[in-house]
């Protein structure tokens, strides 16, 4: 029974980590577009998310050679 509870808790933690990363990658793209073009996707090229402690670093790149980083903070409810 203890082994089952341990395996179940590990699975829940892994699921939480994956869901935070997916949400943060989506937030990364939205923040890039919102901060530079006020929601216009015309010049958007790519957004890459890298998880870090208590948040993540978001790399934004646009077709007009504009590149910058944004730091996203995880907020768990």
UniProtKB/Swiss-Prot annotation:
The keyword Transmembrane helix does not apply. Residues 1-25 form the signal peptide. Contains 2 disulfide bonds. GO terms for molecular function: toxin activity. Expressed by the venom gland. Keywords: Disulfide bond, Neurotoxin, Secreted, Signal, Toxin. GO terms for cellular component: extracellular region. Residues 26-46 form a propeptide. It is found in: Secreted. Belongs to the scolopendra neurotoxin 3 family. This is Putative neurotoxin 3. It comes from Scolopendra mutilans. The lineage of its organism: Eukaryota, Metazoa, Ecdysozoa, Arthropoda, Myriapoda.
